[in-house]
Each structure stands twice: as C-alpha cells, then as structure tokens.
C-alpha cells in the first residue's frame, strides 16, 4: 500500500493553476502538471490528460507516457508517476522534482524505475514548492514524521515560515511505502 497526501494550494495567486490527476488501483498512477502564470494549457488538453490517467490502470507506464506526450508537448513542466509497494516509475520534465528518502538518505529520483522497500518515503513536487526548501529540511521532516500527512504539514510549515504561503501555487505529493498493510 502507498500512503499518500496531496497538497494543492493557490498561495498568493488569484487561482490555482497546477493540476494533479490520480488513479488509485493496484498501483497509484499520477500526473502532476506545473503551470506557472505564463504557461498556457487548454482545459480540453487538461481533460484529455485526466482521462488518460483515469484509464491508466490497464496501460503499461510507457504506453501512458506515449499517450500523454503529444498533449503535453508544449507544457515544459510535468511528471508522470506510477508507484506500488515494490517500485516507482517516474517520467519528469522541467521544474518538477521527485526525491526518495531511503535508509536515512535523500536522493533525487531519476527518470525510470527505482526499487522500493517498506518505509521508503517519496516526495514529488513543483519548483514553486521546492523554492523555500532544502535537502536537509526534506530529509529531517521525512524521518520524524509518522504519516504522509504529517510530513507534508511539516514541509508546509517551513514554507510558511519563509513566505507565509503568499507567493505562487504550491503542489506536492508525499508518499510512504507500507508493504505490510
């Protein structure tokens, strides 16, 4: 099982522009779209990505990636994720980030597949979310948190201390692998 917590906050902006689409099935499949103010992305394209993610439980990850690529070709900042209690597969482009806390160490996740173990923690987020954080903050909050929600709360408190959540949209997902559940 993958415990997860999703944050979507408009920050100091008039509207929330990023998108997170999720499919909960035997594996958790997700698309995170980072839309800075200057980015243009149509509602129809957004709906197409959402529909593909919703139908993705019967697709291989590479097929999903190939299906969304023509839609997202002009959007420079996005991430596709498929995670279960054994592996995570990521495809990220632009200013979106994925980190894993494994055996007390923080590492940036590369594109492709990575093995997971019980208790591993993963954060996927936009560049705006990362702006006020550093590796030590992410790692220390991950190791002291008992849940994905608590980890997110701790990170948001750090961001709030720096900018009172008054700047851009904040989008992130924290995940904890719970193999025994």
For each feature predicted by the language model, list its residue ranges.
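Active-site flanking residues adjacent to catalytic metal/cofactor-binding acidic residues
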Residues: 33, 124-126
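C-terminal catalytic subdomain
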Residues: 1-2, 16, 117-120, 130-181
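Catalytic core of PPM/PP2C metal-dependent serine/threonine phosphatase domains
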Residues: 47, 53-101, 159-179
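Short, contiguous clusters of charged residues that form electrostatic/catalytic patches at enzyme active sites
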Residues: 66, 124, 153
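Short, surface-exposed beta-edge/turn micro-motifs
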Residues: 27-28, 76-78, 119-121, 170
């Amino acid at each position: 099982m993958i415990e997860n917590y999703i944050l979507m906050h408009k920050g100091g902006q008039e509207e929330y522009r990023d998108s997170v689409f999720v499919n909960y099935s035997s594996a958790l499949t997700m698309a995170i779209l980072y839309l800075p103010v200057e980015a243009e992305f149509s509602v129809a394209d957004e709906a197409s990505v959402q529909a593909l993610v919703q139908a993705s439980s019967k697709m291989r990850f590479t097929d999903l990636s190939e299906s969304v690529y023509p839609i997202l070709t002009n959007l420079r900042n996005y991430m596709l994720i498929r995670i279960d209690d054994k592996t995570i597969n990521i495809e990220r482009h632009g200013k979106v980030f994925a980190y894993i806390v494994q055996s007390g160490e923080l590492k940036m996740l590369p594109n492709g597949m990575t093995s997971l173990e019980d208790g591993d923690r993963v954060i996927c987020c936009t560049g705006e979310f990362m702006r006020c954080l550093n590796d030590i903050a992410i790692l220390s909050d991950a190791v002291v948190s008992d849940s994905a929600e608590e980890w997110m709360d701790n990170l948001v408190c750090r961001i709030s201390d720096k900018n009172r959540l008054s700047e851009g949209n904040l989008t992130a997902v924290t995940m904890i692998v719970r193999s025994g559940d």
